[in-house]
Swiss-Prot record:
Protein name: Elongation factor G-like protein
Any GO BP annotation: ribosome disassembly
CDD domains cross-referenced by the UniProt entry: EFG_III, EFG_mtEFG1_IV, EFG_mtEFG_C
Region (G4): 148-151
Residues forming coiled coils: none
Positions of the UniProt region annotated as G5: 267-269
Region (G1): 30-37
Region listing for G3, in residue ranges: 94-97
InterPro entries: EFG_II (IPR041095), EFG_III (IPR009022), EFG_III/V (IPR035647), EFG_IV (IPR047872), EFG_V (IPR035649), EFG_V-like (IPR000640), EFTu-like_2 (IPR004161), P-loop_NTPase (IPR027417)
Biological source species: Mycobacterium tuberculosis (strain CDC 1551 / Oshkosh)
An example Gene Ontology molecular-function term: translation elongation factor activity
NCBIfam families found in the cross-reference section: PRK12740.1-1, PRK12740.1-5, small_GTP
PANTHER family: ELONGATION FACTOR G-LIKE PROTEIN, TRANSLATION ELONGATION FACTOR G-RELATED
């Protein structure tokens, strides 16, 4: 292999690749608590980057360095740690397993070319991990399965393997079997024992012969089925012994193609299986040159020819994560897809979310284009940044103080700006209303939210113009908790969560007349305005109409707009429960004026009073927003989801089959019933369901629900 790595032992100096052939970008995914972060510690020790592993419980791991991660003892963000093994640089991308932080997981998948699905021997496979496997299958991403926590009191390797095969398919086959303090290689038929950080080789015990032969036969048949040599299976079934080197070669090709998925058992606490896993990562997983690049466009949206993953190609890189630190400033984690990044050069920064996603994120991620100068380059080892002289195609690096770059932005040559189509961002669907605890902190809150939005595309910030609330749209309660925690600890802003107000509206159920009289004459210049109006309801979406039918100049011409202004002001305030009035026609019929005391203000007040009197004379109904939702749910949970939708006053529009034993349910549900649906649906379907929502229309709220709202308003 031409591209090799300049490697130094220890954490101070980073391994440096000469080209993309010497790089492997590997993302670790799987359930929360499966041992991904601890596995990275063990791999760093095996590669002699660390002398001893850190501990999640003690808050000393390389990848869980954020204050929230240390406190919660779980990953909440993406982190990268690199090592060198057998002349190859391996970038290990640690991702959270908890569903609230799926945005970090998506970024990790974008940064990597292959994936390790990490499953704990005492837990098995959860539904979100099954769904993620299917997504990786659709794009042909190479994968391997790692079964961890072999030393756990409730560990059962055989059950975990069966669960993985049931979930992921029959091409998931073990390369090794756990045995005491080591592993048995099924192709080599050797026992690899670990002691004091060293691996020794010896012959397995005779008692293991039967299970070795059974597993070895299944493995060999699985490899041969994926072989490009069609005669190999016939020769094998005919009794020919296939050379181990041939099997290994075919195995590596099948793994790189994403058609065969080896299983490696690992015990992170003892190091068992770490060297075997590194061998799979460096020999079986493909380099970035074999992984297709994302779609490329010009800033004007014109498709561009695909670039090669080559050091000498035009620069094309992407910001996969952004962090802000009070001391070091903004740091951008960047995956280089083509070209080479060097310090003290100017690159073009492009952000075009709305061009690809219809403006859905433009309020917090506006489109932008500007040139910026590259400052310090480094290779990350968790939060530690190790200096880099240059970063080649296929590698991952950190760039300090790119002031305008946000997560998802593209870096390219300023002479030929390009834009990578961003990866699909999951839509945040849990609304949390907040307010600064102290009014003096409102400016700091605004700054902090702006910076967090630049870092996290799954955080949407809404300034609701109807309810006048600041609403954080998050992925779940844990995500919201991390956001609020960061605001407090990083930006010094104490934030209160307040009751979320759904933007209801009011309208008239029937015709009504109202008399407005605003007269104050107690000496000096007084106030005098009287008007009579009629209010009629209009069809939904008609808005507001104002008609003038005054005869004989009862209301002077210059004060007719004043009456309309007063009516509009009262409509904004509401006439019954404090919500805006919509879809009415107001006709000015009559009125009275005074030659001295009448004024614009007096007739505004009269118009407002007339509308309120008309409202008291008829029935005013509340209108609530209705959303159309689409729920993707495993077939096993369809009944539970349908029952829950019914309890939320939902109307099911239909169901359809989505494949992979899943169903899509379409329904219309009042927004007020959806405020916690992101949390409740996860509980109903064990984290395996997802949904989207879009506004449909306003419609009358049932009396029982409206009564509760009116009681609260009172």
């Amino acid at each position: 292999m031409a591209d090799r790595v300049n490697a130094s032992q220890g954490a101070a100096a980073a391994p440096t690749a000469n080209g993309p052939g010497g790089v492997r970008n590997v993302v670790l995914v799987g359930p929360s608590g499966g041992g991904k972060t601890t596995l990275i510690e063990a791999l760093l020790v095996a590669a002699k980057v660390l002398s001893r592993p850190g501990s999640v419980t003690e808050g000393t791991t390389v990848c869980d360095f954020d204050e929230a991660e240390i406190r919660q003892q779980r990953s909440v963000g993406l982190a990268v740690a690199s090592l060198a093994y057998d002349g190859i640089k391996v970038n290990l991308v640690d991702t959270p397993g908890y569903a609230d932080f799926v945005g970090e997981l998506r970024a990790g998948l974008r940064a990597a070319d292959c994936a390790l699905f990490v499953i704990a021997a005492n837990e098995g496979v959860d539904e979100p991990t099954k769904s993620l496997w299917q997504e990786c299958s659709q794009v042909g991403m190479p994968r391997a399965v790692v079964i961890t926590k072999l030393d756990h009191a409730r560990a059962n390797y055989r059950e975990a393997l069966t669960a993985a095969q049931d979930a992921f398919g029959d091409k998931v086959l073990p390369l090794y079997l756990p045995s005491g303090d080591g592993l048995i290689g099924l192709l080599s038929q050797a026992l690899y024992e670990y002691a004091d950080g060293k691996r020794t080789t010896r012959t397995p015990a005779e008692s293991d012969t039967e299970r070795i032969e059974e597993a070895r036969g299944a493995l060999i048949e699985g490899i041969i089925e994926e072989s490009e040599d069609e005669s190999l299976m016939e020769r094998y079934l005919g009794g020919e012994t296939i050379d181990e080197s041939v099997l290994i070669q075919d195995l590596e090709k099948a793994v790189a193609r994403g058609s065969f998925f080896p299983v490696i058992p690992v015990c992170s606490s003892t190091g068992v299986g770490t060297l075997e896993l590194l061998e799979v990562a460096t020999r079986g997983f493909p380099s970035p040159m074999e992984h297709p690049l994302p779609e490329v466009f010009t800033p004007q949206g014109v498709p561009h020819a695909e670039l090669a993953c080559d050091n000498d190609a035009p620069l094309l890189a992407e910001v996969v994560k952004t962090t802000s630190d009070p001391y070091v400033g903004r740091v951008s984690l960047v995956r280089v897809f083509s070209g080479t990044i060097r310090p003290d050069t100017t690159v073009h920064v492009s952000g075009h979310f709305s061009s690809f996603f219809g403006g859905g994120t433009s309020n917090t991620h506006p489109d932008h284009d500007e040139d910026e100068r590259i400052g310090v380059l480094s290779f990350p080892l968790g939060k530690q940044q190790r200096p880099a002289a240059a970063v080649v195609a296929g590698d991952i690096c950190a760039i300090g103080k790119l002031s305008r770059a946000e997560t998802g932005d593209t870096l390219s040559d300023k002479a030929e700006p390009l834009v990578l189509k961003p990866w699909t961002m999951p839509e945040p669907l849990l609304p949390i209303a907040i307010a600064a605890h102290a009014k003096t902190d409102e400016d700091k809150l605004s700054v902090g939210l702006g910076r967090l939005a630049a870092e996290d595309p799954t955080l949407r910030i809404e300034q609701n113009q109807e309810t006048h609330q600041v609403v954080l749209w998050c992925m779940g309660e844990a995500h919201a908790g991390v956001v609020l925690d960061t605001l407090a600890n990083r930006y010094g802003v104490s934030v209160d969560t307040i009751e979320l107000r759904v933007p209801l509206r009011e309208t008239f159920a029937g015709n009504a007349k109202g008399h407005g009289r605003h007269i104050k004459q107690s000496g000096g210049h007084g106030q005098y305005g009287v008007c009579d109006i009629e209010v009629e309801p209009l069809p939904e979406g008609s808005g507001f109409e104002f008609l003038d039918k005054v005869v004989g100049g009862a209301v002077p011409r210059q004060f007719i707009p004043s009456v309309e202004k007063g009516v509009r002001a009262q409509m904004d305030k509401g006439v019954h429960a404090g919500y805006p009035v919509v879809d009415i026609r107001v006709t000015l019929l009559d009125g009275k004026a005074h030659s001295v005391d009448s004024s614009d203000f007096a007739f505004q007040m009269a118009g407002a009073l007339a509308l309120r009197e008309a409202a008291a004379a008829t029935k005013v109904i509340l209108l609530e927003p209705i959303d159309e939702i689409s729920v993707l749910v495993p077939d096993d949970f369809v009944g539970a989801v349908l029952g829950d939708l019914s309890s939320r006053r939902g109307r099911v529009l239909g169901t359809e089959t989505a494949g992979h034993d899943r169903t899509v349910i379409k329904a219309e549900v009042p927004q007020v019933e959806l405020t916690r649906y992101a949390i409740d649906l996860r509980s109903l379907a064990h984290g395996a369901a997802s949904f989207t929502r879009s506004f449909a229309r306003y419609e009358p709220m049932p009396e029982s629900a409206a009564a509760r709202v009116k009681a609260g308003a009172g």
